[in-house]
Swiss-Prot record:
Keywords per UniProt: Acyltransferase, Cytoplasm, Iron, Metal-binding, Transferase, tRNA processing
Pfam families: TsaD
Name under which the protein is recorded: tRNA N6-adenosine threonylcarbamoyltransferase
Cofactor binding notes: Binds 1 Fe(2+) ion per subunit.
Record GO terms (molecular function): iron ion binding; N(6)-L-threonylcarbamoyladenine synthase activity
Catalytic activity: L-threonylcarbamoyladenylate + adenosine(37) in tRNA = N(6)-L-threonylcarbamoyladenosine(37) in tRNA + AMP + H(+)
InterPro entries, sorted: ATPase_NBD, Gcp-like_dom, KAE1/TsaD, TsaD
Protein's gene: tsaD
EC number of this enzyme: 2.3.1.234
CDD domains for the chain: ASKHA_NBD_TsaD_bac
Keyword 4Fe-4S on entry: no
Gene Ontology CC: one annotated term: cytoplasm
PANTHER family: TRNA N6-ADENOSINE THREONYLCARBAMOYLTRANSFERASE (PTHR11735), TRNA N6-ADENOSINE THREONYLCARBAMOYLTRANSFERASE, MITOCHONDRIAL (PTHR11735:SF6)
Essential cofactor(s): Fe(2+)
């Protein structure tokens, strides 16, 4: 059976637990999404932390029961230690430490962003070095992955993340939270050429992103058009997605060129994070990467959003590197960049 790891994820508003082997066989996977936040149009930190506290133990018990394993069968416990909402992180880290202490199993402090970056390697042949684009509610950045725990940042969002832009556009249109799936759904029935929104930094050097101007332009369009019918809502969503696609293509081209200047043989672009589940953007990104002689690789859609499998797999990768420790002295970190992992 090999090594077996328990993964715990509580960095934001998903409580997630998974049990898997070092060969990628998943014994259990439980995710609880907190619907309470939809009424507020975004994540409320106190509500998120309380929900983790109420349900994490329940999910772990359920996962252990479904797997047919006992805690003695585990090789290690992997837990997201940052970055994220500190209150939410504390719940997961303290629970994982308690399990580690009681079972005398080593514990691995997992970087949430690294977990997103590595999960595509679980069932696909991706060797280092490779380029990573993380696009989620809290992060938007290009990383060059040299090895487990070793990354260089090529660029990132200078204001809002892409996931945040999706959420705010959805909120302005009254589509609810989370915004990404809602906008994508409406865009399928809309015209992407109905509105032209600004492409910030488009065709300029560098690998940074800017989405604040795009959000403002969408707000102005909504105010200018007055009461919106269903057709108009769909057209705004489609035009917004078209704009995002153009921005990503421009930045990806630059990032691939920059990565190749630093490392020869870059032939994979891993695109991960919640926004990477968007089907329209997957198609645009795949074509752009192919044009640049690179293969775009996406995790399965259910592993793009926050989940326990990615944390457990990051634990596997770190376990192999000898990074599982018996010490319980680490603390959750609201800010923890990938380049500072090592």
């Amino acid at each position: 059976m090999g090594e077996v790891l328990l993964g715990i994820e509580t960095s934001c508003d998903e409580t997630a637990v998974a049990i898997l082997t070092d060969s990628g066989e998943v014994f259990a996977h439980e995710v609880l999404s907190q619907v309470e936040h939809s009424a507020y149009g975004g994540v409320v930190p106190e509500i998120a932390a309380r929900a983790h506290y109420d349900f994490l133990q329940v999910l772990v018990k359920k996962a252990m029961s479904n797997s047919g394993l006992k805690f003695d069968d585990l090789s290690s416990i992997a837990v997201t230690a940052g970055p994220g909402l500190v209150g939410s992180l504390i719940v997961g880290v303290m629970f994982a430490k308690a399990v580690s202490y009681a079972t005398k199993k080593p514990i691995i402090a997992v970087n949430h962003l690294e977990a997103h970056a590595l999960v595509a390697r679980m069932n696909q042949e991706i060797v280092f070095p490779f380029l990573v684009l993380i696009v989620s509610g809290g992060h938007c950045q290009f990383m060059l992955a040299h090895d487990v725990g070793c990354y260089s940042k090529l660029g990132g969002a200078i204001d809002d993340s892409l996931g945040e832009a999706f959420d705010k556009v959805a909120r302005m249109l009254g589509l609810g939270y989370p915004g990404g799936p809602a906008v994508e759904c409406k865009a399928k029935n809309g015209r992407g050429d109905r509105f032209f929104f600004p492409r910030a930094l488009h065709n300029r050097p560098g690998c940074d992103f800017s989405f604040s101007g795009l959000k403002t332009a969408v707000r102005y369009a909504i105010e200018r058009e007055g009461p919106l019918d269903e057709e108009m809502v769909c057209d705004i969503c489609a035009s917004f997605q078209e704009c995002v696609g153009d921005i990503l293509v421009s930045r990806i081209r630059n990032a691939i060129k920059a990565a190749r200047q630093l490392k020869e043989g870059i032939d994979k672009l891993v695109v991960t994070g919640g926004v990477a589940s968007n089907g329209f953007l997957r198609t645009i990104i795949s074509q752009c990467a192919e044009d640049m002689g690179v293969t775009a690789v996406f995790p399965p859609r259910e592993l793009c959003t926050d989940n326990g499998i990615m944390v457990a797999w990051a634990g596997v990768e770190n376990f192999r590197k000898g990074n599982a420790v018996a010490s319980l002295g680490f603390a959750p970190r609201a800010r923890w960049t990938m380049e500072s992992i090592s």
